Design a protein with these regions (language model features):
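DNA-recognition element of transcription regulators
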Residues: 108-121, 158-168, 180, 193-213, ...
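The short loop immediately C-terminal to the conserved phospho-acceptor aspartate in CheY-like receiver
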Residues: 13, 56-57, 85
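Short hydrophobic/Thr-rich beta-strand motif most characteristic of the beta2 strand and flanking loop
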Residues: 28-35, 43
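Basic, amphipathic DNA-recognition helix from helix-turn-helix-like DNA-binding domains
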Residues: 60-62, 68-137
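Short, Lys/Arg-enriched segments at the junction into DNA-binding effector domains
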Residues: 5-6, 118-177, 181
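Charged docking surfaces used in two-component/phosphorelay signaling
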Residues: 15-26
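Acidic catalytic/metal-coordinating carboxylates
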Residues: 36-39, 62-65
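Active-site beta3 strand of CheY-like receiver
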Residues: 48-53, 58
Length: 235
């Protein structure tokens, strides 16, 4: 294959799985498939992939549980949820399980290919060398790129890859407002109304992890009509 990237598609719908397999392979990727969650997870744990595309509603194991098991195995491989379950609650569950991106069926294959390119680019350490080895500190917050963790007031917190990148971007602009457009560009590389909603879901998940009370943020503040700002506790 031209670019050598390996992608696993896990979906119990034969038509969708075969369509994606054809179009993704035509774009130069090596493609493997699984028709249920249990087989998909087994393939992830026993093979090396650069990205996983997961359906949610599948026999033997649903996509949320597959994603959760991938993260519990300490694998940082990008996970793209591609499913008919498109409510905010569904997306929140997916992101909490460790998904990096979420597209709702029916989908445009070109949109899927765009998301694949962005997720693969984000997962390349050489593209962002500062993310691979620099421990960043601001106020009483430290973040550790090698483990995707942050420490706040001596409390170690495990983050998803996307939560980590959002926090990293905010820490680079510590105590200053960061626009939604800047966050979308630095974390995803593109923006749309759908992506703004996705960003807000991720920010909600990040607040649940780092804030003493996520309903009364002390670190990660919303700046009306602008975006978000990370500050020292209570400011």
């Amino acid at each position: 294959m031209e670019n050598g990237k390996r992608i696993l598609i896990v979906d119990d719908d034969d038509e969708i799985r075969e369509l994606l397999e054809f179009d993704i392979a035509q774009s130069g990727y090596f493609v493997d498939t699984a028709s249920n969650g249990k087989d998909g997870l087994n393939k992830v744990l026993n093979n090396s992939y650069d990205l996983v595309i997961l359906d949610v509603m599948m026999p033997k194991m649903n996509g949320f549980d597959v994603c959760k098991n991938i993260r519990q195995a300490k694998l940082s491989i990008p996970v793209l949820m591609l499913t008919a379950k498109g409510t905010i609650d569904d997306k929140t569950v997916g992101f909490d399980c460790g998904a990096d991106d979420y597209l709702v069926k029916p989908f445009d294959v070109q949109e899927v290919l765009l998301r694949i390119r962005v997720l693969l680019r984000r997962n390349q350490p050489q593209a962002e060398p500062s993310l691979s080895n620099e421990i960043l500190s601001a106020g009483n917050i430290e973040i550790f790129p090698d483990t995707l963790e942050c420490v706040i007031v001596n409390k170690k917190i495990k983050l998803t890859p996307t939560e980590f990148e959002i926090l990293y971007c905010l820490m680079q602009h510590f105590n200053n407002a960061v626009t939604l457009a800047t966050l979308l560009d630095e974390v995803w590389g593109y923006d749309s109304d759908e992506d703004v909603r996705m960003l807000r879901v991720h920010v909600g998940g990040l607040r649940n992890k780092i804030e003493p009370d996520s309903k009364k943020p002390q670190y990660l503040h919303t700046v009306t009509n602008v975006g978000y700002k990370l500050t020292p506790f209570g400011e």
